[in-house]
Structure formats: C-alpha cells, structure tokens
C-alpha cells in the first residue's frame, strides 16, 4: 500500500509522505516515512524546542546547576516535564535557574547578566560546584559569548566547572538536534578530564537512561548483582564528574539510541570502547539485554541466575495482567525510539495489539526499526498533528494510548484512557518489576469504570446508562 493521505490532510498533500500503513510483502525502504525534516507550516505539530531535549539529558544530573540564559519563559519546560528522582534528595527537581533576560539585556547584551547570575547561583548553592549553561533563541541571536563568560567565572572560582551548550531552539528541525549538540559537546570538552577509582574487573557506561521515576536505580540493582561497575550513567541519577570519566569503561551499553547514541559512537571512535544496544522495557527484551551484557564480560551463569530469579518473582504477576489485556488495542505516540522499544514488548509480553504509532522527533532509522518490529495493518506517522490523531483514532479505535500529558489530556476528552509514556504514571517501567508496573497502569487505564462517566450527562434525569459499569475488568 502506498503512503496514506488522510482526509484531514487534503489541503496539505505533502503530509502523505509522512504516514505509512504497513501492508503484506512491501519493501519498507520504498515506503519509509520522511522523518527528521522541517515541519510543514500549518500542520499543528506536536514537536518541541531544542532546549527541552538538551535539558532532558543535562537536567537529570543530580549535582549540577542548570542555568538557562534567556527570558524567564524559556525556563518553564524544565524539571516538571518528567520526573527524574535522584538519591541525593532530588536536588535537580527542586530548582530552576534563569538569567531572566529583559528587553534591555537583549538590546545591550546579556553577558554581564549571565556572569552575575552564575555567581549568584554558586553563592546560593555553596555545596554545588558544577553548572551547565544553555543558550536560548534571544541570547543566540544577539551573539552572547557564553563560553567566554564561563571561562571567566571558572577563573574567578577555581573549584567550579562549567559546561556550555550552544543550541538555541531555532537551530534544528526538531528537539532531536539538542541531543546531538550536547552529546558531541560533552565528549569534545569534558570526557577524559577526570579519573575515578575502578573497583570491578567489569566496567561499563549505561547510556540513554534518565531515571524516570527510578528506572536507573532499579536497573542498577541488576548491575550490582552481576558485579558490574557503572562508570557513568548518561545521565539518570548521574553526576557531572562521573560523565568526565566515561573513557575508563570497557563497554558502552545504549538504551535510548536517539538521545545518546552519538556519544557512544564517539567513545568507540576515539577510545575503542565497543557499543552494545539493548532494550530495557519488557521481559523478553530485558532478559536479552542482560544476556548480551553478560556474554561480553563472560559471566553468562550470573546473568541466567539473575533472569531466573526475576522471572520467578515477577512473571506470575505479569501473566495475570496479560490475561486481562489480551487483544486490547493500543496506539503509541511518543518522541522517537520508544516506538520500537515498546511495540514488540507490549505485543509479546502483554498480548496487546499495537495499531498506530507516531513519532515527534524520530529519524528514518527509528522508523526502519519500528516498522520491522511492527505488524501489518499498523499506521506509522512522523511529526503527527492533532487532526491526524483524531482521524487515526476513528480508523483504528484504540482502547488505550501511550503518550505524554499533552496528547493524553486531549484524548481523554474523547473518552479514551492514556498511560503516560513520557514521565510515567506510577513507574519505574524498565526492567522486570518495571514492566509489571507498566502492565498494571495499562490495566487500570483500560478497565477504570470512571472513564465511562465522561459520556454521561448527570443533569439528565432520564439517563438510564449505569453510572458505574460493573464487570468491566
């Protein structure tokens, strides 16, 4: 089947190249959706600013001030968008720093303002000695030299270290560019500027995991049981200085390839550290990932023992949910790689049928992976918009949608439940225990009788529809 032109896109026919319906015996290379391309004007894109994706990586660090050099509004989309707990009292979730640029600073320059705010932040947080400074659209347009300011502050304060990220919101087609700039900037400027103590014969960097509701901390229990030292978490529950030591690891394990695969590639090129990609959502994928890591280190028996213990503990609970979710239909509308991380895991481990997928900032390689893993009859959408979501919902009639709150609150008005695939409902979702949590939240969303109230007009005394639909589970 060719690419699909939805009815809502008839006035924007260019959108046809971005939507694919998988059919039998088709060469997916011929029908691969266009991705990582500029949004077509007028399409009500769900994409976000590049600053947001830089903060998704850098903002997770637990010991670092995140200074946003720009108007106060640019600091809105920060710590509250996802929940990144840490084991030091959640420092990164308590504060937002902004230089609060005003019109006069735009006219006359904001470098003095930035310098003042950097000193002020370090004075107010005397125990914090690390900072990342981000440019925004206004400060980039007026040419503020944030690197020069950072060098001046570090010279005046020898005990601090500052990293700058120059990637204003307008400099890419989607937020994905922010990932790339931060990855490459970090390895160019900060990797191999510090050494840490190595305490195990097995060492790795765990790359592309941001500790959403404790993902990193749950997986860390696996690595501890296997005797593997994680040199650096990029960046969930991680520290600024640990990331400076990434060159010391024997292996780079990559979870989210879109946000962090760039630094893994550079570590391989510059230091010869091999890259190993895994999926950590789903029982089958998590077990496969553990086996791959253990095979690299030659500790296969330890890995099999860990997998057996986790299966014995959590598989019966997963099977309970699978029995009750079997045959339900799901749409997955997330950022990029989670499409291909989740599609097969929810189908194989939960018996759910994935009927539509949309990516905000995925690249063509992400669509290659998800289409290869997905089933026939599924819609694949790049940079989907609100009207397309409505039409796709009418076509595939999903029982539940995995997405973020922005789209999630929209579909709730259509009486369709959603599970927060960005910040999670009640995570963690990674690992064996985490996937049981995901199954539980999906079950609760699908079978919650309260959602049936949305279609009931309680003011109508003649309404005969039961307020609570019994036996929905």
From Swiss-Prot:
Reactions it catalyzes: N2 + 8 reduced [2Fe-2S]-[ferredoxin] + 16 ATP + 16 H2O = H2 + 8 oxidized [2Fe-2S]-[ferredoxin] + 2 NH4(+) + 16 ADP + 16 phosphate + 6 H(+)
Stored Gene3D superfamilies: Nitrogenase molybdenum iron protein domain (3.40.50.1980)
Pfam families, per the entry: Oxidored_nitro (PF00148)
Cofactor mode of binding and number, as noted: Binds 1 [8Fe-7S] cluster per heterodimer.
Cofactor: [8Fe-7S] cluster; [7Fe-V-9S-C-homocitryl] cluster
SUPFAM superfamilies membership: Helical backbone' metal receptor (SSF53807)
Enzyme class: oxidoreductase
Its EC number(s): 1.18.6.1
GO BP terms in the entry: nitrogen fixation
Keywords for this protein: ATP-binding, Iron, Iron-sulfur, Metal-binding, Nitrogen fixation, Nucleotide-binding, Oxidoreductase, Vanadium
TM regions (residue ranges): none
GO terms, molecular function: ATP binding; iron-sulfur cluster binding; nitrogenase activity; vanadium ion binding
Amino-acid positions noted as binding [7Fe-V-9S-C-homocitryl] cluster in the UniProt annotation, renumbered to this chain: 256, 422
Amino acids binding [8Fe-7S] cluster: 49, 74, 137
PROSITE patterns per the UniProt record, alphabetical: NITROGENASE_1_1 (PS00699), NITROGENASE_1_2 (PS00090)
Family: Belongs to the NifD/NifK/NifE/NifN family.
Other information: The structure of the 7Fe-V-9S-C-homocitryl cluster is assumed to be analogous to the 7Fe-Mo-9S-C-homocitryl cluster.
Subunit details: Hexamer of two alpha, two beta, and two delta chains.
Role, per record: This vanadium-iron protein is part of the nitrogenase complex that catalyzes the key enzymatic reactions in nitrogen fixation.
Protein name: Nitrogenase vanadium-iron protein alpha chain
Organism: Azotobacter chroococcum mcd 1
Gene transcribed to yield this protein: vnfD
């Amino acid at each position: 089947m060719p690419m699909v032109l939805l009815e809502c896109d008839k006035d924007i026919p260019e959108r046809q190249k971005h939507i694919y319906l998988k059919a039998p015996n088709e060469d997916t290379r011929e029908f691969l959706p266009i991705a990582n391309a500029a949004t077509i004007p007028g399409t009500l894109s769900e994409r976000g600013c590049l600053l947001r994706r830089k903060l998704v990586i850098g903002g997770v660090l637990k010991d670092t001030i995140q200074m946003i050099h720009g108007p106060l509004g640019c600091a809105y989309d920060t710590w509250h968008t996802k929940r990144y707990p840490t084991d030091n009292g959640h420092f990164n979730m308590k504060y937002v720093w902004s230089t609060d640029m005003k019109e006069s600073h735009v006219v006359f320059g904001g470098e003095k303002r930035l310098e003042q705010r950097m000193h002020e932040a370090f004075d107010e947080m005397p125990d914090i000695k690390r900072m990342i400074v981000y440019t925004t659209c206004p400060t980039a347009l007026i040419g503020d030299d944030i690197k020069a300011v950072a060098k001046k502050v570090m010279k005046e304060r020898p005990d601090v270290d500052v990293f700058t990220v120059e990637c204003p919101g307008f400099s890419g087609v989607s937020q994905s560019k922010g990932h790339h700039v931060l990855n490459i900037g970090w390895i160019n400027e900060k990797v191999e500027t510090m050494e840490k103590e190595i305490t195990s014969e097995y060492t790795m960097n765990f790359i592309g995991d941001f500790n959403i509701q404790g993902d990193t901390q749950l997986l860390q229990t696996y690595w501890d049981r296997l005797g593997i030292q994680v040199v650096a978490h990029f960046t969930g529950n991680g520290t600024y200085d640990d990331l400076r030591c990434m060159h010391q690891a024997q292996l780079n394990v990559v979870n989210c390839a879109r946000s962090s695969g760039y630094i893994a590639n550079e570590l391989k090129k510059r230091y010869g550290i091999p890259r190993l990609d895994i999926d950590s959502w789903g029982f089958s994928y998590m077990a496969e990932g553990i086996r791959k890591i253990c095979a690299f280190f030659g500790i296969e028996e330890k890995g099999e023992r860990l997998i057996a213990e986790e299966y014995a503990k959590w598989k019966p609970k997963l099977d309970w949910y699978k029995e009750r979710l079997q045959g339900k239909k799901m749409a997955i509308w997330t950022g990029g790689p989670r499409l291909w991380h989740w599609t097969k895991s929810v189908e194989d481990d939960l018996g759910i049928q994935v009927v539509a997928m949309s990516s905000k900032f995925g690249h063509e390689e992400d669509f290659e992976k998800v289409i290869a893993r997905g089933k026939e009859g599924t819609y694949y959408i790049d940079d989907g918009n609100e009207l397309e979501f409505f039409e796709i919902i009418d076509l595939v009639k999903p029982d539940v949608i995995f997405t973020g709150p922005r789209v999630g609150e929209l579909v709730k008005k259509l009486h369709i439940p959603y599970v927060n695939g960005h910040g999670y409902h009640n995570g963690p979702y990674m690992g064996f225990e985490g996937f049981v949590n995901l199954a539980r939240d999906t079950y609760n969303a699908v079978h919650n009788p309260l959602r049936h109230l949305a279609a009931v007009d309680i003011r109508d005394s003649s309404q005969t529809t039961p307020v609570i639909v019994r036996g929905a589970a």
